[in-house]
Regions:
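Histidine-centered catalytic micro-motifs
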Residues: 8, 27, 31, 44-54, ...
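Conserved, mostly hydrophobic/aromatic
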Residues: 30, 37, 48, 104, ...
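N-terminal small/glycine-rich loop or linker at the start of catalytic domains
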Residues: 1-22, 105-116
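Active-site mouth loops of central-metabolism enzymes
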Residues: 10-32, 81-90, 118-122, 144-146, ...
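Alpha-helix-loop-beta-strand connector modules within alpha/beta enzyme cores
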Residues: 8, 55-81, 129-138, 190-201, ...
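Glycine-rich, proline-tolerant flexible connector loops at the mouths of alpha/beta enzymes
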Residues: 18, 43-65, 174-175, 179, ...
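Active-site beta->alpha loop and helix N-cap motifs at the rims of alpha/beta catalytic domains
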Residues: 57-123
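Catalytic alpha/beta core domains of metabolic enzymes, predominantly
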Residues: 103-228, 239-240, 244
Length: 274
């Protein structure tokens, strides 16, 4: 079977040091985590950045420092976030693209994050989506189409049809967000059936769903995402380190008779030109 690409999402926008001391929030911490995760089998790092108060930021200088330090220490594929959970302007969300990442996330729909108190609306208008897609296309940055539900996949296909995303496209199927598609085998099979025939896909399971979604993705021929962005626990009551989650994912894939790709092999699988 084809090799598995492991993406590490070490930081995200939510967990803070008060939640877990293991979440990396500074450029140096993120670069160190990137190095440790590459040693355990990761090929891609999905980068969110924080300011000095641990708040999510799209500041170019912070992303520039973080990306440069990751590249200095690793051969990982760098994927920057273009998240707009905090209601940022489109131009602000595009700032990380100036760091010339290999890939960038492109969320193709809006949803309520009802698991937070108070709840948050993650807004992605069609104008925002196409704005970011055009920026990525112009900069030769491969989008990772981030789908929190089935309709997000259809919007991703629409981008392909309009020439704003080149084929073969890559999708990240985020399962188990409170407000998104529930993390079940039936739902994962259904959403995969909506993908273009030549697309690649990865699966991210949120919280307790991370491990079972890892198993299902490997069995279905997909790739997997792990990390403290999605789940801060290794097991019930035991806080995880990012590199531990990568090591478990690598072991899991091996037990299911799929080897883990190197970063260069992942570049070939995803047809990255950078």
């Amino acid at each position: 079977m084809k090799k598995v690409i492991i993406t590490i999402a070490p930081t995200g926008s939510v967990p803070r040091k008060k939640d877990t001391p293991h979440v990396p929030t500074t450029p140096d911490e993120i670069a160190e985590t990137a190095y440790l995760c590459e040693q355990e089998g990761a090929s891609i790092i999905h980068v969110h950045c924080r300011d000095e108060n641990e708040n999510p930021t799209s500041d170019y200088a912070v992303f520039r420092e973080t990306v440069d330090k990751i590249r200095k220490r690793t051969n990982l594929i760098v994927m920057t976030s273009t998240s707009g959970v905090a209601g940022k302007l489109d131009e602000d969300r595009a700032q990380p693209l100036r760091t010339e990442p290999d890939m960038a996330s492109l969320t193709t729909g809006s949803l309520n994050f009802t698991g937070r108190k108070p709840s948050i609306v993650y807004v992605n208008t069609w104008e925002t989506i196409t704005f970011l897609a055009k920026k990525m296309l112009e900069a030769n940055i491969k989008p990772e189409i981030e789908a929190f539900d089935v309709g997000f996949v259809r919007q991703g296909v629409k981008l392909i049809e309009q020439g704003l995303v080149l084929e073969p496209a890559h999708f990240q199927l985020v399962m188990g967000v409170d407000g998104g598609i529930p993390a079940t085998l039936e739902n994962l099979m259904h959403i995969c059936h909506q993908l273009p025939p030549n697309a690649t896909f990865s699966v991210a399971g949120i919280a307790k769903w991370q491990l079972p979604m890892n198993v299902m993705a490997v069995l279905m021929g997909g790739h997997i995402r792990v990390g403290l962005e999605d789940n801060i626990y290794y097991s019930k009551g035991k806080l995880a380190r990012n590199e531990e989650l990568v090591a478990r994912a690598r072991h899991l894939a091996g037990e299911l008779q799929r080897e883990v790709s190197s970063p260069n092999e992942a570049r070939q699988i995803l047809r990255l030109e950078r």
